[in-house]
């Protein structure tokens, strides 16, 4: 008996998955310890697409800034964790890592917050 060929319906092309991540730098920018434009430039130079930094894959990854929020949009697989890694690298480079931390405040956004050190020190002083 001859093998039976199954008819498989071929699906159309998958629509491009657009990933959109936001970095909220409102607090440090308002306090004047960080420059959002400088951070945006850092991301443009450092984000790697296909193993190459600097060119953003010819428009595959775009970075936009509105006041103190930076939005990274990607049409290729892009990790949110990679964005956190680059943000921490920027903070370390500018000696801000001791005061700021990167916190996920939603599924597709990060926020830069201050460490809550002052409250702990005040509580310790009250106990003495």
From Swiss-Prot:
GO terms for cellular component: cytoplasm; cytosol; cytosolic large ribosomal subunit; glutamatergic synapse; nucleus; postsynapse; presynapse; ribonucleoprotein complex. Keywords: Cytoplasm, Heparin-binding, Phosphoprotein, Ribonucleoprotein, Ribosomal protein, RNA-binding. Its main location: cytoplasm. Transmembrane segments: none annotated. It is found in: Cytoplasm. The modification Phosphoserine is found at residue 66. The modification N6-succinyllysine is found at residue 69. One of its GO terms (biological process) is translation at presynapse. The keyword Iron-sulfur does not apply. Pfam families: Ribosomal_L22e. The modification Phosphothreonine is found at residue 62. One of its GO terms (molecular function) is RNA binding. Component of the large ribosomal subunit. The ribosome is a large ribonucleoprotein complex responsible for the synthesis of proteins in the cell. Component of the large ribosomal subunit. PANTHER family: 60S RIBOSOMAL PROTEIN L22 (PTHR10064), LARGE RIBOSOMAL SUBUNIT PROTEIN EL22 (PTHR10064:SF2). Belongs to the eukaryotic ribosomal protein eL22 family. This is Large ribosomal subunit protein eL22. It comes from Mus musculus (Mouse).
């Amino acid at each position: 008996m001859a093998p039976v060929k199954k008819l498989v319906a071929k699906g159309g092309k998958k629509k491009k998955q657009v990933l959109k991540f936001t970095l909220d730098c409102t607090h440090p920018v308002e306090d004047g310890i960080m420059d959002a434009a400088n951070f945006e430039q850092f991301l443009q130079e450092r984000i790697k697409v296909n193993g190459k930094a600097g060119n953003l894959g010819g428009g595959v990854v775009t970075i936009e800034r509105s006041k103190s929020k930076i939005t990274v949009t990607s049409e290729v697989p892009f990790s949110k964790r990679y964005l956190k890694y680059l943000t921490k690298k920027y903070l370390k480079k500018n000696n801000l890592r001791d005061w700021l931390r990167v916190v996920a405040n939603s599924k597709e956004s990060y926020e830069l917050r201050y460490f809550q050190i002052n409250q702990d020190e005040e509580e310790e002083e009250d106990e003495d």
